[in-house]
Every structure is written in structure tokens, then in C-alpha cells.
Amino acid sequence: YWQPYGWDYGQITYTVQDNVCEVQGLLRGNTWNHLATLPSDCRPSGREIFNMNNHQYTSRVDVLSNGEIHWVTGGSSHGWLSLTGIVFVTNAGPKTGLPFNNGYTNYGHSYEGPYYSKINNECILGGLIGGGNGNNHVGTLPAGCRPRQGLLFNVNNHQCTMRLHVATDGRIHRETGHCHAWTSLAGVTFPASEATKTTLQLSNGWKGYGGYWGTPYYSLIKGECIVQGLISGNKWGWIATLPDACRPHYRLIFNLNNHQYTSRVDVLPNGEIHWIAGGNHHGWLSLTG
């Protein structure tokens, strides 16, 4: 039996806008299977595999085509699970099949085929990749749907977390966490290179990684605040602050990448972004996700 965590973490919410479904919030409970069910206008065409936060652990959470949300494996501690980071194009939305490289293909079965969509200047990816020859370059996005700087996403690989690199030339690379041969694209979204971006105000000595990885930024797209970029530093706590226009109503728990590790990063209603638990290695953290 699962229910909203409440307190500072508020309710579980979903929004559907222009055929994009997004889920946010924190659940508490202890039966690790069927967590919730989304309404008919907020469902994917096929099963999607998301990477959700469970404090220092990562959890595989699947959204099924009938709207059911299931915990599958990974972290099952603390009596809570964050659903923040579930975002996908619904079964009514426009999708284009991902151009594959190196023999990769649709995983098939009941899983969503790998796709990209460009909606309101935001690129949204999803689906499950199978096959391949073992090369880490799984597919390439077209010129209209590429990031302005290199981005590192934290995607699910069953009980493991995977670092997924979306390059400025559109290449998609799986870089750590090869626990299984498949690659999930669920949860990968970013503003297209021409979208408006504002430099993020960092704190506590954290800096943009620079060079190819650029400067961390936020974008406000139709009421959705998107924070992305790679930062370097070693004071693991308060990282940055978002302006009034880009703050959540309640505290949100994100699952972000620290190479082979997952990191819990919270965004507070006052705009502060804090590292809380999990990976704190390598002197860097990706805010992308």
C-alpha cells in the first residue's frame, strides 16, 4: 500500500501537456511491486524503464502501457521511493524512431521502441534498445534534436545505474553500468540547442566543468523548469540556487549521475539544489536529468 509521503514532499502529481506526461513526488510504503496507475491520457505506447531514486540506491521503475507504475528491482530501502523524473511522450504523441548504429535495434516484446520527439523546443527520448555489437555508440539524433553541450544522463540498467552520454553531434553513448546488454532511453530529455538557456547560479565553490561540457543552465519551457550540465567541486551539500520562476511547490528528489554511481539531489521550494546521498566521487556531478 503506497501513499504520498506528505510533509515537505507534498503529493504525487502528474501533468499532461502537448502529449508529454510527467510524474513528480515521493511515495511511502513497503510492498515493492505495483505502486500507482496513471490515467488514460498519461500512458506510454509500450513499457518504459525509468531510473528512480531510493536515497543512496537506484531503483528500476517501469511504466506500462496500461498506466501501471511498477517497482521492479534495485533499491527498496527506507520505506520510500521518488517518482520524480518520469517523463515520456504519451500514446497520442508524435514520435520518430531513433536512427541506430552498430547493429542496435528495438528490444521488442512489450517495450516501447526507441524514439525521439521534439515538442516545444524540448527533445524527449524513450524506449528500449536491444541487439548491437558491443560498441557503446547505440544511436544518433538528427541535427534538429541535439544539445548545445555534452550531457550525461543517469538511466536504468536493471539493478544498476548507467551513464548515458548525449553528444553535441547527436551521438548517444552508453558509458558505465553495462550490467545488461540493453539500454533504456526513458527519462532522457533536454532543451534543443536553440532553446533559451540561462546560466545557473552555483554555490559552495562548485563551478561549471567547462570546455565541451560547458556551463550548467536552466530552461523554462511552458512551465517546466529543466536544469542541466556538468559541475566540478568537492563540497557535497548545497550546490546551486534557482530563481523564483524556476522553483517547485514541494521538495523533489532527483536521481543524477556520478559516473558509475547514482546521486540523490534534492530541489527545495526556495530554489536551493542540494546533494544529499549516494555517489560523491570523481570531483564532479551531472545535474542533467
Where are these regions (language model features)?
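Short, well-ordered beta-strand segments enriched in hydrophobic/aromatic residues
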Residues: 20-27, 122-129, 223-231
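Extracellular jelly-roll beta-sandwich "head" domains, especially the C-terminal globular C1q domain
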Residues: 4-11, 28-113, 130-215, 220, ...
